[in-house]
Structures are given as structure tokens and as C-alpha cells.
Swiss-Prot record:
NCBIfam families assigned: rpsC_bact (TIGR01009)
Family: Belongs to the universal ribosomal protein uS3 family.
Organism: Pseudomonas aeruginosa (strain ATCC 15692 / DSM 22644 / CIP 104116 / JCM 14847 / LMG 12228 / 1C / PRS 101 / PAO1)
Keywords linked to the UniProt accession: Ribonucleoprotein, Ribosomal protein, RNA-binding, rRNA-binding
Pfam families given in the database record: KH_2 (PF07650), Ribosomal_S3_C (PF00189)
Domain KH type-2: 39-107
HAMAP family: Ribosomal_uS3_B (MF_01309_B)
Protein name: Small ribosomal subunit protein uS3
SUPFAM superfamilies (UniProt xref): Prokaryotic type KH domain (KH-domain type II), Ribosomal protein S3 C-terminal domain
A single GO molecular function term of this UniProt record: structural constituent of ribosome
């Protein structure tokens, strides 16, 4: 079952939180949901170069609070806050209610599944060999302290005539364990040969009693002296 279901969806309410938090009656529910989708599309298009991982939307009492999780907050904020103020005005006009924008910086982008997937996809678009791109991302995540990581790419890899799937894994990725904090994301690389899909699973540890295991960077192994 853990292999089939969406890793984030099955963990909602256990170790994951919803990205949209609001209440609506039957009449307004579809409108709110569609508005959230449009806001996310707008922000992802507007902030393509800002390494945005996640966008949380809260709607408390006739207002909206949008939290943008990004590895490059300076690009979102802009010079003297001009860019974020322009974003706030555009979103207020689009949503029809006053909007407050919070910027959350991602300290370790190597442990964020969406940012890893974006990085691998960008390398594939620059014609980097897919095995090299996957291996580099896996090594960076494990070095920072991930318990396990799996990366899968699917499509016409290397310009092959027949599409295929390749994956690379290191460490543990226990999809059946519901208390396991597994970050999952997908992204698309648009190459001259077609679209290549990228999937990333990152296991950060188990959440027990509301507390997560502390991630510790892995110290590099000491080099062995060559025998003379």
C-alpha cells in the first residue's frame, strides 16, 4: 500500500500538515479551491528563479495569509521590499480580500524534495548525464544528514528511442511507516527529446511523540594513506 499511495497525502494529520487551511460551506468550497490553485500557479510562474518549495494558504476571517517557503528569500522580497509589496497587491486584487505574505527561508535546500527535483530537472535540461545528476543530489542529501533518499527519472533518457525508468537510492526510505517523515515531490524537465519526469523521496527520520529525530551531518570518511 505504501508503494502505491501518495507519500504526503497518507501522512496528513500524522506527520504532515495541509498546505491550504480554511473552512467553506458547500456553495463556496469550489471557488476557494480554484482560487488556491490559481494563486499557486501565479506564484510558481512569477517566482521561477526563487527556488520556491511550498506555498501555504490560510484564510482567517475575510483575509488571506500566504507563506512562501523558499531557499532564496532575497529574490522574493526584492530591493527594499518592492517585489513582495507588488506581489501582495496583485494577490489582493486576485483573491478579493486583504493578503499578508510571509517568507520562510529553507536553510537546507539539499533536504527539500521539491528543490532537489527542480535541481535535477534543470541539470537534465542542460544536458547533464542523468546518472551524474542523480548521484550528485543523493550524495549532497546524505552528507547534510538525510536518513535516506531515492530519486527516479522517467522518459527518453539520453535521447534514447524508447522511454525507460531509472532510479538511484541510498539509505532507508520506509514508505509503509506512517510516522516516518518522508518528503516527496515531482517535477518535469523539458528537454529537446521530450518531457522527463523526476520524482524524489527524502527520509528525514521518524516523528515519535510529536518530536522528530535530529538530523546530524555525516562526517566525511578519513582518507586511507596509499601504501608505498
Amino acid at each position: 500500500m505504501g508503494q502505491k499511495v501518495h507519500p504526503n497525502g497518507i501522512r496528513l494529520g500524522i506527520v504532515k500538515e495541509h498546505t491550504s487551511v480554511w473552512y467553506a460551506d458547500r456553495k463556496n468550497y469550489a471557488d476557494y479551491l480554484f482560487a488556491d490553485l490559481k494563486v499557486r500557479e501565479y506564484l510558481q510562474d512569477k517566482l521561477k528563479s526563487a527556488s520556491v518549495s511550498r506555498i501555504d494558504i490560510h484564510r482567517p476571517a475575510q483575509t488571506a495569509r500566504i507563506t512562501i517557503h523558499t531557499a532564496r528569500p532575497g529574490i522574493v522580497i526584492g530591493k527594499k521590499g518592492e517585489d513582495v509589496e507588488k506581489l501582495r497587491q496583485d494577490l489582493t486584487k486576485q483573491m478579493g480580500v486583504p493578503v499578508h505574505i510571509n517568507i520562510e527561508e529553507i536553510r537546507k535546500p539539499e533536504l527539500d524534495a521539491m528543490l532537489v527535483a527542480q535541481s535535477v530537472a534543470q541539470q537534465l535540461e542542460r544536458r547533464v548525464m542523468f546518472r551524474r545528476a542523480m548521484k550528485r543530489a543523493v550524495q549532497n542529501a546524505m552528507r547534510i544528514g538525510a536518513k535516506g533518499i531515492k530519486i527516479q527519472v522517467s522518459g527518453r533518457l539520453g535521447g534514447a528511442e524508447i522511454a525507460r525508468t531509472e532510479w538511484y537510492r541510498e539509505g532507508r526510505v520506509p514508505l509503509h511507516t506512517l510516522r516516518a517523515d518522508i518528503d516527496y515531490a515531482t517535477y518535469e524537465a523539458h528537454t529537446t527529446y521530450g518531457v522527463i519526469g523526476v520524482k524524489v523521496w527524502i527520509f528525514k527520520g521518524e516523528v515519535i511523540g510529536g518530536r522528530q529525530e535530529e538530523l546530524k551531518p555525516v562526517a566525511p570518511a578519513p582518507r586511507k594513506k596509499a601504501a608505498r
